A protein has these predicted regions:
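P-loop/Walker-type NTP enzyme "switch/lid" segment
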Residues: 59, 83, 89-167, 222, ...
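Walker A/P-loop phosphate-binding motif and the immediately C-terminal alpha-helix
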Residues: 51-93, 97-99
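Short helix-start
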Residues: 24-48
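Short, well-ordered amphipathic alpha-helices
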Residues: 39-42, 73, 158-159, 212-219, ...
Length: 319
């Protein structure tokens, strides 16, 4: 995907300034991502520190719009100035495609890291944003669960692989397949935060129940406690009575995990995915883009507060 360009209004919004605060000598009709990065340095407009977050987007139920959500979320965090690594865990390579790339074009995937001990740094690719990197996926990833099966410490392979690069990123985002196996177990064991995209239908409850049972077993058996679990209602259509009833049920049964932000049904998500572009590139003024920004606005203060409450841990990771 070619690098996008931005208007002065968009740039000012990303930097948290008014357009008039952009230095006159730096003003242009259109700005590239590199231009924006230079402006950040000039104006010293970097976002608040998050520590080093590892965030997993997962639902054992398919069809929840998880990949469109995770890739647009990662893209927007990068636009806002965070250093982001997006790791595609799905052998279908949909997250890779949403960034405008074909997984088959890459020789190495996470399989090489977890099974063949290739350093993660050798698999990481650059995107069209200077501060958004990604690990691609393709059909070779379909064998990773089987390959991990006989290995000692198999559930910790991903967590250990991240240690060599984690200090370079504010956020690592995992886009996981809708299944439970050793790869997703690795992702759960590596994650600080779990995002669970759900549809407002009653079929989602079964998947949620199974996922929360898995999270609880990780706490009890492997002593791994997630910092945050965020349930995100995706593709919501308020004109459907059943959708409203399902939302009310989610609010009743999962109030402590359910984000107040709702991602409304938006055709731009499907269009953007088919074009190999995040929704913030396809249509930055769409409902989908606005709702993901609202979700980020809701989540970031919690992450900033968590980082501030654990300075010793953050300093240790940064070193």
């Amino acid at each position: 995907m070619e690098a996008p360009t931005y208007s002065s209004k968009q740039v000012a919004e990303m930097l948290g300034v008014s357009p008039k605060q952009i230095p006159e000598e730096s003003r242009k009709d259109a700005y590239t991502p590199d231009d924006i990065w230079e402006l950040r340095a000039t104006l010293d407009r970097f976002p608040e520190r998050l520590g080093h977050r590892r965030q997993l987007f997962l639902n054992f139920k398919g069809g929840t719009g998880k990949t469109s959500l995770s890739t647009s979320y990662a893209w927007r965090l990068a636009e806002l100035g965070y250093a982001v690594l997006l790791i595609d865990l799905d052998s279908q390579g949909h997250a890779t495609k949403c960034l405008g790339y074909e997984g088959e074009d890459f020789e190495k995937t996470l399989l090489d890291v977890l099974v063949r001990k290739t350093p993660l740094a050798k698999v990481i690719q650059k995107s069209s944003l200077p501060n958004l990197d990604f690990v691609p996926s393709n059909l070779t990833m379909s064998t990773v669960d089987l390959a991990l099966m006989p290995m000692a410490g198999r559930e910790f392979k991903l967590r250990n692989a991240l240690k060599e690069v984690e200090a370079q990123y504010d956020v690592v985002v995992f886009d996981a397949p809708p299944s439970f196996g050793l790869l997703n177990l690795n992702a759960l064991m590596a994650a600080n935060d779990l995002f669970v995209p759900v549809l407002a239908d009653f079929l989602s409850f079964h998947g949620l129940k199974l996922l929360f049972e898995t999270v609880q077993s990780l706490e009890e058996d492997l002593n791994h406690v997630l910092d945050h679990v965020f349930i995100v209602v995706n593709s919501f259509n308020a004109t459907f009575k059943l959708a409203k009833e399902a939302l009310e049920a989610l609010q009743t049964h999962y109030p402590e995990f359910l984000l107040p932000t709702i991602i409304r049904q938006c055709t731009k998500f499907a269009q953007a995915s088919s074009e190999g572009r995040p929704v913030f590139v396809a249509d930055p003024s769409s409902k989908g883009a606005n709702d993901i920004q609202a979700m980020i606005d809701n989540v970031l203060p919690r992450l900033v507060a968590a980082a501030a409450a654990a300075p010793a841990k953050g300093n240790q990771q940064a070193g």
